[in-house]
Amino acid sequence: MTKSKVYFTDFRTKLGEGLPTKLKRLIKDAGITDIDMDNKFVAIKMHFGELGNLGFLRPNYARAVSDVVKELGGHPFLTDCNTLYPGKRKNALEHLECAWENGFTPLTVGCPILIADGLKGTDDVEVPVAGGEYIEKAKIGRAIMDADVFISLTHFKGHETTGFGGAIKNIGMGCGSRAGKKEQHNDGTPTISESKCRGCKKCQKECANNGLVFNKETKKMSINPDTCAGCGRCIGACNFDAIAFENYTAVENLNCRMAEYTKAVVDGRPTFHISLVVDVSPNCDCHAENDAPILPNIGMFASYDLLALDQACVDACMNATPIRNSQLGDNLAKKDFHDHHDHFTNSTPESEWKTCLSHAEKIGLGSRDYELVVIK
């Protein structure tokens, strides 16, 4: 069986060729020009970053991709869906304002920006999942499913629940409407350690579902299982490591659901996938802050095979040297820390990522066996 090709270039530049130009060259070498985009609507799925976060991909990278799409005769638009939790991206009006404030405007990115699931996150399409074991019909933002061609542009980084956020996370969770996101999270209810909880209520402020309750007598927080959506937002909000998923089956189920949502998005139409391993923060760009990178900047990857792409990015990260003054570096420096020999697990020990890739391969999203083609 022929290995999937993943194309890679590092962040070194030469006189006269900046990174946006180098990205254009990478995706052309990776075969994006083979897709018929003439007069087609082309969705470019990316994360605009929560307001206050500076870890997200710069608009210049999105502009490079939209320029190539237009060169090929396509009609590109940047897109994402609304979130489950408080912040600037829970409805389309605030989401667009957030994108603009973070530098994503039609002028800077060279194309329109659409919030795919509409004003309140309810404009979705139920899409059957071929071979799905967890999801029968995925709830995907309508504008994403209306597109003729789908391109993912992913900031590859760590994640407090899923270990890392790559193409599958960007597509599967990101393309789900608010109802779709809740469906993917519906097995996961974290627990709170009373001994570690300081009662600061920061987690409560981050919850959109009244899932956290403050006990006035104990001065501690607790989870309300009846209202908790299992989104994991509170885990990243806690500065004291007091909140975690102890039910690893729930995290594994989340990973599998994300893979199946991804399959619903990409099946049946031309797709292409780009991931940048840069500013590798330990947590999701959904937070209003970003901690120091846990790994050095590695480079830009592109492939038709999104699973091979995620695997290549994981492998590159595992071969990188951890940054000392970071969440990962701090953990490794602890005398009693158990080294998992896995940068993502070492950064966030309560996370789990391997089931996502294995389930994705099982349902036919791609292959984890790849050939890395290096572009100078």
Say what each PLM segment does:
Residues T2-N53, L57-Y61, V68, L72-D80, ...:
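Extended, low-polarity segments enriched in aliphatic/aromatic residues
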